[in-house]
Amino acid sequence: MKSFVCIALVAFAAAALASPTNVASATGSTGSSVTTQDGELEGVTGQGFGDLTRLRKSAYGGSSGGYGGSSIPAPPCPKNYLFSCQPNLAPVPCSAPAPSYGSAGAYSSPVATYVAPNYGVPQHQQQLYSAYVPQTYGYQY
């Protein structure tokens, strides 16, 4: 723990020595010369090492705010456009009209099903299965 505190103090002292501070003086010329030297060190007057304005402007085309401005604003996306917001597409209706059953298409009746318990059973064994077939409603086996 003592070594950690010592390392932290040494790092703090090194950081304090590395960055020059503006010492108050009787004349203001010393402060302005320090500022001028800092500007010459950084290459651009008024920008610090931590300022990323130049990088941001070069990466996003010179826009000052947000993620960069676009030169052409995007049109609002209307509803019922198929797959895209481009203005050259025709609007698609919500449901295609059908001639006979509203918008759900033509009604088709269910496929007819018949009870055929003897399907695939040989003729001589059909009497064995007759007990399981209902004998009412016209089913005569």
From Swiss-Prot:
Signal sequence region: 1-18
VM domain boundaries: 71-108
InterPro entries the record matches: Vitelline_membr_Cys-rich-dom
Any one of the GO BP annotations: oogenesis
This protein's GO CC annotations: extracellular region; vitelline envelope
PROSITE patterns assigned: VM
PTM info: Sulfated by pip; may be involved in embryo dorsal-ventral axis determination. Sulfation by pip may occur on covalently bound glycosaminoglycans. Becomes part of a disulfide-linked network including other vitelline membrane proteins, including Vm26Aa and Vm26Ab, during vitelline membrane biogenesis and maturation. May undergo both disulfide and non-disulfide cross-linking upon incorporation into the vitelline membrane.
UniProt name for this protein: Vitelline membrane protein Vm26Aa
Species for this entry: Drosophila melanogaster
Gene behind the chain: Vm26Aa
